[in-house]
A protein has these predicted regions:
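Beta-sandwich interaction modules
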Residues: 1-14, 49-101
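Generic detector of ordered secondary-structure context
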Residues: 24-25, 73
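Aromatic/hydrophobic beta-strand junction motif of beta-rich domains
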Residues: 19-24, 81-83
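Non-cytosolic beta-sandwich-type ligand-binding/adhesion modules
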Residues: 25-67
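Short beta-strand/loop motifs in extracellular/secreted proteins, especially
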Residues: 17-19, 27-32, 89, 93-95
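Intrinsic disorder/low-complexity segments
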Residues: 7, 20, 38, 45, ...
Length: 101
């Protein structure tokens, strides 16, 4: 599957991490909020990152348009977002990801 990974975002180590994510046009895939406790995590090194929360859209759960939130209290120094596209001919898209901590 094709996937996109955001750049890393410096976070407040022990605070709530909130993200608002908007998808549209029947997006099929997985959106994941990831964190890292490393001082200098590498974008390409998956072992530097752990999953905080995931939202999955498949044929049964896809929607024309939706905004949802991740809201988790996690101890980490960095945050990033990843989305994986599950269909080769997909028309759906992730419109925006807004992050606050």
């Amino acid at each position: 599957y094709d996937y996109y990974v955001s750049s890393r975002i410096k976070s407040d180590e022990s605070d709530y991490h909130t993200a608002s994510v908007t998808v549209k046009n029947n997006f099929l895939g997985t959106i994941t909020m990831e964190g890292s406790a490393d001082v200098n995590p590498q974008e390409a090194n998956e072992s530097d990152w752990f999953v905080i929360d995931t939202k999955d859209y498949d044929d049964e759960t896809k929607v024309d348009e939706e905004t949802f939130q991740f809201n988790k209290q996690v101890n980490c120094m960095w945050i990033r977002f990843k989305y994986t596209i599950k269909a080769a001919n997909q028309q759906g898209e992730v419109v925006e990801i807004l992050y606050r901590n």
